């Protein structure tokens, strides 16, 4: 069944294939265009460098008028990521716009890795370390980067 949300997701997928952003990839799961699997590679020159972080993106039939739900499947230590992998990012909540597509969502999350918002912490321990003890924060991030290599 073709719906506006499904047609839009097909366009998003086509755009992602034709003009893939650096360091991110995503595709619908095999038998459900409303659920995507994605990967974000840790940005160069950041504590997340060399990490391979898996995510799942779930869309409703109200997409693109409503944002998708995005969660890290890979373990993540970041001020704006909850323990269950949910991401605290304004464009996935109150600043959502139907002009955003899968590509822009993934690149925004990739940027968030290096530029957390400590004023909106989802993980207070990570936020505190990020602000008060960068070296310890980076050590914890290094551990999850190494762990990401073994995630299958």
UniProtKB/Swiss-Prot annotation:
Q: Does the keyword Ribosomal protein apply?
A: no
Give the GO terms filed under biological process for this record: apoptotic process; chiasma assembly; chromatin organization; DNA damage response; DNA repair; ectopic germ cell programmed cell death; in utero embryonic development; meiotic telomere clustering
The protein's name in its UniProt record: Ubiquitin-conjugating enzyme E2 B
| GO CC terms, sorted | chromatin; cytoplasm; HULC complex; nucleoplasm; nucleus; plasma membrane; replication fork; XY body
Q: Does the record carry ATP-binding as a key word?
A: yes
Report the function annotation for this chain.
Answer: E2 ubiquitin-conjugating enzyme that accepts ubiquitin from the ubiquitin-activating enzyme E1 and transfers it to a E3 ubiquitin-protein ligase. In vitro catalyzes 'Lys-11'-, as well as 'Lys-48'- and 'Lys-63'-linked polyubiquitination. Together with the E3 enzyme BRE1 (RNF20 and/or RNF40), plays a role in transcription regulation by catalyzing the monoubiquitination of histone H2B at 'Lys-120' to form H2BK120ub1.
Write out the annotated subcellular location: Cell membrane; Nucleus
Q: How does it assemble?
A: Interacts with RAD18, UBR2 and WAC.
Per the database record, which ranges form the UBC core domain? 4-150
Q: Which UniProt keywords apply?
A: ATP-binding, Cell membrane, DNA damage, DNA repair, Membrane, Nucleotide-binding, Nucleus, Transferase, Ubl conjugation pathway
Q: Name one GO molecular function term.
A: ubiquitin conjugating enzyme activity
Q: What is its EC number?
A: 2.3.2.23
Q: Where is the signal peptide?
A: none
SUPFAM superfamilies from the xrefs?
UBC-like
Biological pathway:
Protein modification; protein ubiquitination
């Amino acid at each position: 069944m073709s719906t506006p949300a499904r047609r839009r997701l097909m366009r998003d997928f086509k755009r992602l294939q034709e003009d893939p952003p650096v360091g991110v990839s995503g595709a619908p799961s095999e038998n459900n265009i409303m659920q995507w699997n994605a990967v974000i590679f840790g940005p160069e020159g950041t504590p997340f460098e060399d990490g391979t972080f898996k995510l799942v993106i779930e869309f409703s039939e109200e997409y693109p008028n409503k944002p998708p739900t995005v969660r890290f499947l890979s373990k993540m230590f970041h001020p704006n990521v909850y323990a269950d992998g949910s991401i605290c990012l304004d464009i996935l909540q109150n600043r959502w716009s139907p002009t955003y597509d899968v590509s822009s969502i993934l690149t925004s999350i990739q940027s968030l890795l290096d530029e957390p918002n400590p004023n909106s912490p989802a993980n207070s321990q990570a936020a505190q370390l990020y602000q008060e003890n960068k070296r310890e924060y980076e050590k914890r991030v290094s551990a999850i980067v190494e762990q990401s290599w073994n995630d299958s």
